[in-house]
UniProtKB/Swiss-Prot annotation:
Comment text on domains: The tyrosine-protein phosphatase 2 domain (D2) mediates dimerization. The extreme N- and C- termini of the D2 domain act to inhibit dimerization and removal of these sequences increases dimerization and inhibits enzyme activity.
This protein's record includes keyword Zinc: no
Protein name stated in the entry: Receptor-type tyrosine-protein phosphatase epsilon
Keyword terms of this UniProt record: Cell membrane, Cytoplasm, Glycoprotein, Hydrolase, Membrane, Phosphoprotein, Protein phosphatase, Repeat, Signal, Transmembrane, Transmembrane helix
Entry EC number(s): 3.1.3.48
A GO biological-process term: negative regulation of insulin receptor signaling pathway
Disruption phenotype: Mice show greater insulin-induced tyrosine phosphorylation of insulin receptor (IR) and insulin receptor substrate 1 (IRS-1) in the skeletal muscle. Antigen- and IgE-mediated passive systemic anaphylactic reactions are enhanced. Erythrocytes exhibit abnormal morphology, increased Ca(2+)-activated-K(+) channel activity and marked perturbation of the erythrocyte membrane tyrosine phosphoproteome.
Biological source species: Mus musculus (Mouse)
Length: 699
């Protein structure tokens, strides 16, 4: 809104005056009546009109000034230089600022702690009406801006050190660096001390370093004796820089006076662990180097929150495990240092509260840490995610095991308290069957044209991770195949779980293998079992066969114990294209060790199959592995679960069969379909440990 126009104000005043003159019944007019004809003397009425109009003019002027100032503030917030996304949607930190301006002035509401036994019901109530109660609770939080001053953060020398102009540390909780001689305000960094559940200053919440502040960031890590950095953003999201890369990819680099050397880097599906050795490079420094672990959570999507809290809970446990008890505050940062950072800190604190008091008080804790750093937990979606993570933790607990305790755990799972109780294994599997099948996310598979492509209509892919084929020109629905991307232990979308091809979907199957550059096919069914078709034979016994634009030629077929290994030369050529034919070798591992009924008698065959597939992947590159049985869920899920579980056993000496299977069921319905298959997962792991424990460092 532009400044209130004086001409407009004058025009409005004149209208008021004319309205007053035109009213014949007013006392003012009657005072001017006279026995003499003619108009009244205008000079005589001026003092009275002036007294009437002055208050109106003053009121209008004050209103104009107020609206101009309000509009200016809103413009400053919304424009915020280049902090808009290309489509005009405001970034999270800007959404929060605008939202705070429109907050209801009514008094604060009170939200009480929730006993954990009531947590599921409370979340159900709050989630009704599109999470209306969650939004109400979130909008009742204090912003944190009122409780502190921001003088240091707003100093001219420090403004360029702030990534976002409206995300600043309070003066009373900011991290203070040692002053560098001759450099004013060199004690400033955009970072705040944040309490844990009961531990004061357990965390430092910081913005993602800018190029100009990397030296300060490492100075803070050294001076605060921090041993753990938690990173919750990617370097770029939506093509916008969220954090400057403040570490070397390899070797050493010096940031200011701190030398940082890479010691190790382990990439997992949800996060990456980097280990650095840091050491000050001052002439008179004789301090010993320190080891700093950076845990970088890479599964936070560009929009919203993670689809499931499982990955975050695993990540948080790893942070707790790696952080030494004697170390300084854990440094936590995202981009602004409030949204994802606050979410992580609140989940950690509330998990501790569950252990201590068997209840959670999310509202009170978020209110408290917003006094230390404004806007912690930035959106209602993040606020809701906290509750979802806490419910996941309460319902399923910590099911992770060290390999040395597996045998004892299996004994517990096979025991019962009374004859009427289910054994622990059945109860564990029952919890898995409670994982909700999200039918609302199966719209594509449920289209009539695509339902004809399903072997089992209950087992179709979710829309969010279905394998998408290129659309054939002029042919609708040809981008669909009943197949789902499934995460591996170290890599997202490492597997393509699919059904055994039908006669009319063989071409789609080979198109998928070709387009997604899959060099490995794992087949876990026979073509026929119990006189029923389970899978169309999609390869030639000899010579070659063509499906659409793809020709498959068999080059070799060898049987080793229970596994047939077939090598195919796959050729792709579009009939009307002038380009040369493209060829690729694809290897199929056909496992014959699965009986028609039940599960394999021992686990060695499955262990050998997984090892052979991994060796093939190392030679051909880590493109997706195509895995199928008949419906693409039971045996397929068991193979993928065991691949991920055994990979973790080898890498960490840890396993979590329950969460491994639960994660698969969130990606494709009915994965690991029966109690027998679930128990088989435990059996194979035990066999693996027994076979390799003599020369592997498991125990």
């Amino acid at each position: 809104m532009e400044p209130f126009c004086p001409l407009l104000l004058a025009s409005f005043s004149l209208s008021l005056a004319r309205a007053g003159q035109g009213n014949d019944t007013t006392p003012t007019e009657s005072n001017w009546t006279s026995t003499t004809a003619g108009p009244p003397d205008p000079g005589a009425s001026q003092p009275l009109l002036t007294w009437l109009l002055l208050p109106l003019l003053l009121l209008l002027f004050l209103l104009a000034a107020y609206f101009f100032r309000f509009r200016k503030q809103r413009k400053a917030v919304v424009s915020s230089n280049d902090k808009k996304m290309p489509n005009g949607i405001l970034e999270e930190q800007e959404q929060q600022r605008v939202m705070l301006l429109s907050r209801s002035p009514s008094g604060p509401k009170k939200f009480f702690p929730i006993p954990v036994e009531h947590l599921e019901e409370e979340i159900r109530v709050r989630s009704a009406d599109d999470c209306k109660r969650f939004r109400e609770e979130f909008n009742s939080l204090p912003s944190g801006h009122i409780q502190g001053t921001f003088e240091l953060a707003n100093k001219e020398e420090n403004r360029e050190k702030n990534r976002y102009p409206n995300i600043l540390p309070n003066d009373h909780c900011r991290v203070i660096l040692s002053q560098v001689d001759g450099i004013p305000c060199s004690d400033y960094i955009n970072a705040s001390y944040i309490d844990g559940y009961k531990e004061k200053n357990k965390f430092i919440a910081a913005q993602g370093p800018k190029q100009e502040t990397v030296n300060d960031f490492w100075r803070m890590v050294w001076e605060q004796r921090s041993a753990t950095i938690v990173m919750l953003t990617n370097l770029k999201e939506r093509k916008e820089e969220k954090c400057y890369q403040y570490w070397p990819d390899q070797g050493c680099w010096t940031y200011g006076n701190i030398r940082v050397c890479v010691e190790d880097c382990v990439v997992l599906v949800d996060y990456t662990i980097r280990k650095f050795c840091i050491h000050p490079q001052l002439p008179d420094s004789c301090k010993a180097p320190r080891l700093v672990s950076q845990l970088h959570f890479t599964s936070w999507p560009d929009f919203g929150v993670p689809f499931t809290p499982i990955g975050m809970l695993k990540f948080l446990k790893k942070v707790k495990t790696l952080n030494p008890s004697h170390a300084g505050p854990i440094v936590v940062h995202c981009s602004a240092g409030v949204g994802r950072t606050g979410t992580f800190i609140v989940i950690d604190a509330m998990m501790d509260m569950i252990h201590s008091e068997q209840k959670v008080d999310v509202f009170e804790f978020v209110s408290r840490i917003r006094n230390q750093r404004p806007q912690m937990v930035q959106t209602d979606v993040q606020y809701t995610f906290i509750y979802q993570a806490l419910l996941e933790y309460y319902l399923y607990g910590d099911t992770e095991l060290d390999v040395s305790s597996l045998e004892r755990h299996l004994q517990t799972l096979h025991s019962t308290a009374t004859h009427f109780d289910k054994i622990g294994l059945e109860e564990e599997f029952r919890k898995l069957t409670n994982v909700r099948i999200m039918k609302e996310n199966m719209r594509t598979g449920n289209l009539p044209a695509n339902m004809k492509k399903a072997r089992v209509i209950q087992i179709i892919p979710y829309d969010f991770n279905r394998v998408i084929l290129s659309m054939k020109r002029g042919q609708e629905f040809t981008d669909y195949i009943n197949a789902s991307f499934i995460d591996g232990y170290r890599q997202k979308d490492y597997f393509m779980a699919t059904q055994g091809p039908l006669a009319h979907t063989v071409e789609d199957f080979w198109r998928m293998v070709w387009e997604w550059k899959s060099h490995t096919i794992v087949m876990l069914t026979e073509v026929q079992e119990r006189e029923q078709d389970k899978c169309y034979q999609y390869w030639p016994t000899e010579g070659s066969v063509t499906h659409g634009d793809i020709t498959i030629e068999i080059k070799s077929d060898t049987l080793s114990e229970a596994i047939s290994v077939r090598d195919f030369l796959v050729t792709f050529k579009q009939p009307l294209a002038r380009q040369e034919e493209q060829v690729r070798m694809v290897r199929q591992f056909h496992f014959h060790g699965w009986p028609e009924v039940g599960i394999p008698a021992e686990g060695k065959g499955m262990i050998d199959l997984i090892a052979a597939v991994q060796k093939q992947q190392q030679q051909t590159g880590n493109h997706p592995i195509t895995v199928h049985c008949s419906a693409g869920a039971g045996r397929t899920g068991t193979f993928i679960a065991l691949s991920n579980i055994l990979e973790r056993v080898k890498a960490e000496g840890l396993l979590d069969v329950f969460q491994a299977v639960k994660s698969l069921r969130l990606q494709r319905p009915h994965m690991v379909q029966t109690l027998e298959q679930y128990e088989f997962c435990y059996k194979v792991v035990q066999d693996f440990i027994d076979i390799f424990s003599d020369y592997a460092n498991f125990k």
